[in-house]
Structure formats: C-alpha cells, structure tokens
Amino acid sequence: MATIYYDKDANLDLLKKRKVAIIGYGSQGHAHALNLRDSGVDVRVGLAAGSKSKAKAEGAGLRVLSVAEASKEADVIMVLIPDQTQKKVYDEEIAPHLSKGKALLFAHGFNIHFVQVRPPADVDVLLVAPKGPGHMVRRQYQDGRGIPGLVAVHQDATGQAKAVGLAYARGIGCTRAGVLETTFKEETETDLFGEQAVLCGGAAALVKNGFEVLVEAGYQPESAYFECLHELKLIVDLMYEGGLAWMRHSISDTAEYGDYTRGPRVVDGRSKDEMRKILKEIQGGHFAKEFILENQAGGPTMARYRAAEAAHPIEEVGKRLRDMMSWIREAKKDSSDPGSR
C-alpha cells in the first residue's frame, strides 16, 4: 500500500524560503504558478521567446522571464513543458544554471526515467504530479480543497528532497486531498501503460470499432455515435464516482447482465496478452526510443495518424451532434485557455 502524506506532513515554510520557477504556462503550469503565488511562495514563470502565454501569465500578475533567466534566479525549478521538448530546453537553458543544492522538479518522469535529461549529482531531482487537469487543480485550490497527487524522489543531494516535494505539493493544494509516495519508474511506466492500453489507445479503439460495427450493419451513424461514444461519459462518470460496483449498481439489469456475459468476449485473454506486450515495450524502453526517434524525425508518423483519424466518419457525425448540445459548447468554453497543450 502506498504511503500518503497530508498538510500536516508538509512544511510550506521550506518552500517560502526559496525562489520557484515554473517552466511553461499551459494546463498545469498556470495552475501551479497561481496556486503557489496564492500560497505565499515567490514565483516566476519561464517562457520561450515569443510565447503566446506571456500575456496570460503577466495578465494574472505573474513575473515572466526567459527560461534561462528564471532557472538562474530560482532555487526550485518545475519543468512543465511537453515531454518531447524537455531535453532541448533543459540542455540549453536550464542545465547551465543548475548550481549545487537546487531542486529540479517534474510532473511526469519520462525524461528522467528514460535518461533523456541527466541532472548533475549535486541537485535534488523529484516529481510532484497532481492527478487531474490544470483547471481542476486551480479550481479545487480556490475552493479550499485539493487534487490528490504523487511525489517521488529520484535524487536526494541535499537530504531535503522529499521535504521540498511535499512543501511544493502543499503549495499547489495536493496535500489537502493526499499525496501518494511513488517512484519515477512506477509513475512513468504506469502512466504510459494507462494511456496506451486503456484510457486513450484502448478506449479510442474500442469506441471506433463499436461505431464501425453498427454502421456496417446498416444502423444510422448518429445512433452508433450515441451508443458507442456519447454515452461512454455516463458510464465513466459512474465508475469515477464509485468504481465498477457503483456503475453496475446504477445501470439497468439488462445492461449489467450484458456487461458480465458479453464484455469478456470483447476484451478477452488475447487483449490482456497484448496489454502485457505493451507493458514490456514500455518497461524495456522500446516505446520511449520509438517516440524520441519519431520527434527527432519531425513527427511524420504522428502527422499521418492525425490526418487519418480526423477523416474518420465518427468525427463528422460527432461534430454535427455536438452542435446540438449547448452544454458541451459551454463546457468547452469554460475549460479553454490557459488549458491548452
């Protein structure tokens, strides 16, 4: 069982004595910067030259510097830019300013675990990862609550790495809900597996296949969309609220019986075997190498997939149906910038 830390376990004063730099101002970056600022921490934001986020950050009352300037000034540096850009930014703008005793933080362990970023031995390296999107991290903080999170230490040069991580987690509100102790290896590998096999890859493939089966059988695309994609949120929300048992308690007996007797025929032992293969590819670094090489080549495979998926009939049908749903338009407006990639 994981060790869980709360407000009482975290000394925010430890962070208030230091200067913090948030590198990036996207979904997580804006939430971290604003929550830390409101917790009384000395925060600055580091952005690339010409970043569109500069005006947003300054409009929120934050001090904006270049990544290099922010890294030079700060004692604690949180890297919140995309995985594929971290190595270059780190090598060119952060590493030259990592003097002894500083702390380097990440919200995802990819580049540390797969040795793309190689910090010097005399700095602390740790992970603080809220388990929710940035707008929720911010909203919960403002409401006096918090999002559960993860904390991990990769390198403890000062003897205070975990304490700094817990202080940071408290500053953004996570220790209000609880912060689970983990490792860079566990966070990285389970996060990638969840994305690929279940949350993104698995769910998207299941939805698309279900849609295609119904349309190929002669049913209207609109009906197929409702049954295989739109209503998925209803089921996921129930699982989110109370697990599989609550979902099954909340649906009809017909749906529950079909769940038990037909679900394992769709996602069966063969699917589980493929999941194991995917996990091994992650553990062995094969996926990381593939993704790194893809980005070094300019992302041609990703571009082909994006174009092909955008042209799938489910997208056109979905757009027409979502235009009928005013609450979806309102939700998208509420969760827009700064929540972009």
UniProtKB/Swiss-Prot annotation:
Binds 2 magnesium ions per subunit. It catalyses: (2R)-2,3-dihydroxy-3-methylbutanoate + NADP(+) = (2S)-2-acetolactate + NADPH + H(+); (2R,3R)-2,3-dihydroxy-3-methylpentanoate + NADP(+) = (S)-2-ethyl-2-hydroxy-3-oxobutanoate + NADPH + H(+). Residues 1-182 form the KARI N-terminal Rossmann domain. One of its GO terms (cellular component) is cytosol. Residues 183-328 form the KARI C-terminal knotted domain. Its cofactor is Mg(2+). InterPro entries: 6-PGluconate_DH-like_C_sf, KARI, KARI_C, KARI_N, KARI_prok, NAD(P)-bd_dom_sf. Mg(2+) 2 binds at D191, E227, E231. Mg(2+) 1 binds at D191, E195. GO terms for molecular function: ketol-acid reductoisomerase activity; magnesium ion binding; NADP binding. NADP(+) binds at Y25, G26, S27, Q28, S51, S53, D83, Q84, T85, Q86, G134. Belongs to the ketol-acid reductoisomerase family. This is Ketol-acid reductoisomerase (NADP(+)). It comes from Anaeromyxobacter sp. (strain K).
